Amino acid sequence: MPVRFRGLSEYKRNFRWKTPELCSPSQEQKSPWAGLRSDQLGITREPNFISKRRVPYHNPQISKSFEWTGDCDSDDPVETEALKTAESLAEHSNDVNQENTETPEGPRLPPKVRSHSSDSGVETALALAGNSMKKTPPVAPPNQKEAFVSPKKEAEKVNNGLHRVLQRKGGMNTPHLSTFPRNSEYQSQFVWKSPHEKSPILAAEEALYNTKREELIQKPAEDASKQEKSEQKHPKRKNKQHISQKPLSLHTHRGKMNTEYRSKFLSPAQYFYKDGAWSRIRSKVPNQASQNPLNSMWYMEVRELRARAKAYRQRIEGTHFSRYHLNQLLSDNNSLWDVSSNSSSEEGISNDIRALDLAGVSEKETAPRPKMLQQPGSREQSHQDDTEKKGLSDAPTVPVKRRLVWGEQEGTAEKDSQQLREEEEKENEQAAVVTQNLEKNNEGINEDNRIEGENTCLPNSPAAVSESSSVSSEPGGRLPTPKLRALGRAQRTHHDLTTPAVGGAVLVSPPKFKSSTSQQRMRSLGTDPSSVGQGAREASQRRSFRPGAKLKAVSLLTSPPAGLGTVDPLPLRQDQWHPNGVSGETVAINSAYQERSSTPPVLKSTKNRPMPCWSPSPRIQGTLKDPEFQHNGNVGNPKMGSFQLPLQERNYNNEDDRLSQISARSAASSSLASQILERAQKRKEDFWGKT
């Protein structure tokens, strides 16, 4: 047999577990409850139950007049009168229906006697005994086989009932009898479950305790009489004793047990922060409780800061975003877009993630850009072949300064600006030749017809397209097509009216300002045809040398966190329409486009003349309102830079680059896809609100 260590270990000495004694009450706690009703325990009001109490039903055939009252003294006149009337009624009913009468099997229990005395338990038992002695069954018909209860069994029942009451008063465990009545409504509905069998040691202790209790109960009657006399002399003392006799609670509170968890993990209210360390509040040390509310406030502040840090970390990791952005990233149309990122840093990423990441610009593609800029001759020759294959006019357009994508270096932008300045100096030398050629071509034409012809042909020319496209490619939202822009107002779509410009939404609305240039353009209709070249050059200057363009683009790139409301920095245009005819001018556009495409040298010289003031070319007034031409940016003028072109075309920065971008954008499915692509190209550094 192995020897087990039965001593107290260090853990048991320091930390005590709750013993099961608290769950099972001891005999001292159970003895005052035994055999007492709720009114004796100090409960003067029973609980309200929702359901009706089920009262046992007795057959009302036999009245109380059949109860034997011969042994009792009929001192009460009311009872005797009631008994006489009941007997007379019973005799009459027996005479009429003797065959239908039935006799009870045994004596019924009397109604519950409620008394507020402390020893009413004994009284109920005695009353039961007396009533059972008084009751004798009536004469049974001869055909009934059931025998009556003998007087010996009656006496045994009385003795058992008295002994049972004494046992319950003494605190002994007495089994519940089905015939014994419940003392209160609560006990009748909520009965204690039968306890488990006790061990022999507990049974022996209970026997010893019960013998002591029986000795206390069986006191002589003299002590009881003396106590009654003293209560009659001093009634106040009786009330005090009755009030002081409160039942012991079933679970006595011995204080909180010092468990291991409670000793190690205390609430933050029991600590205070001092000199960079947390220390526990001691009850003996003064001036510590005053700092307790401040410490709790500090604790709540720490929790709030941790919650904020978690939110910021989720934003950086990309797990905190708007569902609108997720809808754009997981769109099926992403497969139609050009993959613009093949850098070495993303070689380990799967193809699906690389297809979703549309903001990348490869280092391999941007590196040969300076070399391509040093070869203008070969570039022009190769691009002319491309334009002839595509069926477009080979007339070059105005050079446009490209906006920086996040992956490009600032040095390339500086080289672009220097290249533009050199080209514009060459344009100044050819300005006079352009004006003379235009005057010779238009000498024999009437002035009114000349204005109308210029209006119809120039909007479709590559120069006009490049001019309007260059203005439309502002850092903000989309400007209308060249035809709609001549009208002074773009026809709005549901995208223009509902979507904001920042925060992952589509940028489709034009700026709301009415520039002085547009007013001068309306006044200068019918002026000298040399204004065509001036307008194109002025548009290129405004596009390439605008000082506030870069700042505005930076402000739009910094989008707020997802889920927050945004303000549209580019409101809708509020210009007015100019009602004019449509039918004749639309036919003239196609003929004028073929006419101008056959004379590329003349139009090429129009872009080379810078002028000090803005002199726009004559425009079509009030035309192209037909829904056939309202494609929301598909006709020649979606926003510039919305697509990443192939490597050859993206490295250009002159008129060939402009024409290739126009041809690529004309193949786009809609303006919505192009704007989403541009939004995705700017998101890697600035999409999550990083500064």
Swiss-Prot record:
One of its GO terms (biological process) is negative regulation of centriole replication. Residues 234-243 have a biased composition (Basic residues). GO terms for molecular function: microtubule binding. Residues 219-233, 380-392, 412-423 have a biased composition (Basic and acidic residues). Pfam families: MDM1. Its main location: nucleus. A motif (ST]-E-Y-X(3)-F motif 3) lies at residues 259-265. A motif (ST]-E-Y-X(3)-F motif 2) lies at residues 184-190. Keywords: Coiled coil, Cytoplasm, Cytoskeleton, Microtubule, Nucleus, Repeat. The keyword Coiled coil applies. The keyword Glycoprotein does not apply. GO terms for cellular component: centriole; centrosome; cytoplasm; microtubule; nucleus. Residues 514-533 have a biased composition (Polar residues). Residues 87-155, 219-254, 360-552, 594-658 are annotated as: Disordered. A motif (ST]-E-Y-X(3)-F motif 1) lies at residues 9-15. Belongs to the MDM1 family. Microtubule-binding protein that negatively regulates centriole duplication. Binds to and stabilizes microtubules. This is Nuclear protein MDM1. The lineage of its organism: Eukaryota, Metazoa, Chordata, Craniata, Vertebrata.
